[in-house]
């Protein structure tokens, strides 16, 4: 029915992409965890909750920048 059936397993290219983005994915998961803790803090978020949230946000930004820099370096190497 399908000309190119959807593979059941990730391709090597997909695995390589996941590996390249792994640190960003981990940072984003930590950010979601910090956001959940912040939003569910009783009776209100503490200074520690605020600090945890800021650190998680900053980590995501650092990892995004690092990922873009690695990508740009790889383009320069090809050119």
Predicted segment positions?
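Alpha-helical initiation/capping and key positions within long helical/coiled-coil segments
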Residues: 17, 24, 31, 48, ...
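Short, compact, well-ordered microdomains
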Residues: 38-79
